[in-house]
Structure formats: structure tokens, C-alpha cells
């Protein structure tokens, strides 16, 4: 019985080593009168070496109010590896639908610009809330439409991010700059 208790305690302590905080909250952009829902995946240990990753989801027709949690397998994995992960909910129910025809560089630009503004505000607010994080090595990750937003952000604000990763974006041009990589 004593052996079983010791094994149980060891197992519990192992799980606590990998535990992390996960919560959903909202930011508010007063200039645009816009609520920006976000989900945060905080690693167990947070210090000045903790890198930040911002995830930008793909388009879902503004139907799913939790699109930013679609990639929870990735966000949780990154958090377990020690990254502070912020996943932004870009599409809101009242937003115009994404254009499905025409010159996407023109017809989808308002959506991408809205996403860039969401990312920018998120960075600015979290720098105030979590100044102890390593903001010099900020990583943006985006899938599909979120990848387009990521590439546009990297083009407009290369000095704010260290790496831009796109998973299956097809429209936005990848910035040809030394930074971000």
C-alpha cells in the first residue's frame, strides 16, 4: 500500500510539472469600438525568457465564436513547451463576410486590415499586462486567412516580430525582409 501511495504521489507531481493555465478573456479597442476575444495558454513557468506566440485562425464564415480555440492541440503543445500563447478570435458574428470572388488583394483587404489591427492591439495591451515576457522574440502563426493576416502584419510591422509562420496562406505576399524570418 505504501508503494502504491508513493507511485500515486509521483504520478501527480509529474502531471503538475506540465500543468498550465488556460483562459478566455476580451480586449477592447476603443478607437474601433471593437471587442477582441482571446484565449491565453500560459505555461507553468513565466519569466523574462518566456517567448510569446500569437495564433491567427482561418476563416469560418463568422459562425464559430471559438475559432481561436480550433488549434488548441497546437496552442496547448506550445504552452507545454514553455511558450506564452495568445490566440485571437478575429471573426465576429456582425463582421462582413469574407469576399469569395474578385481580386482578393482588394476585396479581402478590409478583413486582413481588421486582423492586423487586432494583432497590433493585442501586442500593445499584453506588453503592458505582461512586460516580463520576451517580446523581442515574438512569433506570429497564422493558418489560411489568419496566415494572410500574419504576412500583412509582418509586412507592416516587421520591427515588432521575430518570426512569421504561415500555414497554407495563398494570397498575401510573404515579406522579403531580413526580419521577421
Identify what each model region corresponds to.
Residues 181:
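Short beta-strand/loop motif that positions the catalytic acidic residue
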Residues 34-129:
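Serine-hydrolase catalytic machinery in alpha/beta-hydrolase-like enzymes
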Amino acid at each position: 500500500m505504501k508503494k502504491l501511495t508513493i507511485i500515486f504521489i509521483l504520478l501527480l507531481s509529474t502531471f503538475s510539472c506540465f500543468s498550465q493555465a488556460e483562459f478566455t478573456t476580451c480586449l477592447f479597442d476603443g478607437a474601433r469600438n471593437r471587442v477582441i476575444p482571446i484565449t491565453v495558454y500560459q505555461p507553468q513557468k513565466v519569466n523574462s525568457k518566456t517567448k510569446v506566440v500569437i495564433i491567427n485562425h482561418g476563416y469560418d464564415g463568422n459562425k464559430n465564436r471559438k475559432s481561436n480555440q480550433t488549434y488548441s492541440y497546437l496552442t496547448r503543445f506550445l504552452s507545454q513547451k514553455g511558450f506564452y500563447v495568445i490566440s485571437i478570435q478575429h471573426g465576429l458574428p456582425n463582421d462582413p463576410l469574407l469576399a469569395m470572388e474578385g481580386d482578393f488583394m482588394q476585396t479581402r483587404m478590409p478583413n486582413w486590415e481588421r486582423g492586423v489591427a487586432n494583432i497590433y492591439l493585442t501586442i500593445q495591451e499584453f506588453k503592458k499586462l505582461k512586460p516580463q515576457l520576451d517580446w523581442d522574440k515574438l512569433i506570429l502563426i497564422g493558418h489560411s486567412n489568419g496566415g494572410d493576416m500574419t504576412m500583412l502584419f509582418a509586412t507592416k510591422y516587421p520591427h515588432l516580430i521575430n518570426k512569421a509562420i504561415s500555414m497554407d496562406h495563398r494570397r498575401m505576399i510573404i515579406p522579403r525582409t531580413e526580419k521577421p524570418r
